[in-house]
C-alpha cells in the first residue's frame, strides 16, 4: 500500500492556490492552519471563510464524494445550514479534497444550545426523516442494522465495573437497564430513515444566542435507526435537551429512551476503553460526554412504555 503523505501547510497552500473557484481563499498567500479539534491534520482552515478537508485513505474518499451529493439532498429539508463545496477534486493518488464554505458559529462542544436551539435540532431530526430513502440509496448511502441494546448493556456492565475500580463511575446506575427493559427498547420494525450517525458536539455549529446554525460531518450517514441520532445528541448537548428535541420532532417514548440508553452504554464503554489504553480521545471530553448522557430526564419515570413510536 502506498503511504499517504501527511499534509503540511505548504501542501495546503499549493493546493488552494491552484483552485480557480476558491476566490479569496486562493490568494497569493492564504492563511492556513490545521483544525485542532478532532486531533487530525487532514482538515485545515483556509483564511476566515473556508475549510479544506482531505481524505486520508480510499474508503474516506468514497464517503467524501458521497457526502457532497448527500448534502445537496438534505439541504432543503433539515432547517439548518450544511456546508457548501466551492471546489473539489483529488489531492493525491485518487484521494479527494473538498474546499467548503465555513459556517459562522462555534462548536457545540464550547457553545451551549438554548431552548430555541433545541427547536433547531428538532427541525434537523424531522428533516432527516423526510429525506427520500430511495434517493439516498441512489447516492450510495448504506443501510445499517439496528444495534442490540442487550449486547451493548452486557458490554457496558463490564466497562462500568472497570470504571468503578478507577473511581470513575457507580455501576449501580446501570441497574435501571434490566435485560427485560433492554428487550422492550429493541429497535422497532419500521422503515429506515436517514441517520446522520455522527452528531457529536464538534459537528454542531452554534451561534452566540444558542441557535444551532449548521451541521457538519455527513460522511458517516446511513439509512437506519433514528435512535442513533438521539443518542448522538444526548452525548453532544445532554440527555434532557436531546429528548426534548426528539419529542418536538415527533418521536415517542420508546425511541427516545432507546437513544438515551445507547448513549449511556456507549459513553461508559468508551471511557473504560480509553483508560485501558485501547481507544483515543481526550479524557476530559470523554468524562464530559458521559456526564451529559447520564443527566436525568423526566421520561425515565415512565414504567410502561407506550406501543407507538
Which residue stretches match the model-derived regions?
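Short strand-connecting beta-turns/loops that link adjacent beta-strands
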Residues: 91-93, 209-211, 264
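Conserved catalytic motifs of the protein kinase core domain
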Residues: 47, 95, 190-192, 211
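ATP-binding pocket architecture of kinase catalytic cores
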Residues: 30-148, 164
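Short helix-capping segments at alpha-helix termini
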Residues: 24, 75-80, 167-168, 240
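Active-site Asp-x-Gly
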Residues: 59, 192-195, 200-256, 260
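Helix-rich C-terminal or lid/interface subdomains of diverse kinases
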Residues: 108, 231-309
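An alpha-helical support segment within catalytic cores of ATP-dependent transferases
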Residues: 5-28, 90-91, 104, 114-115, ...
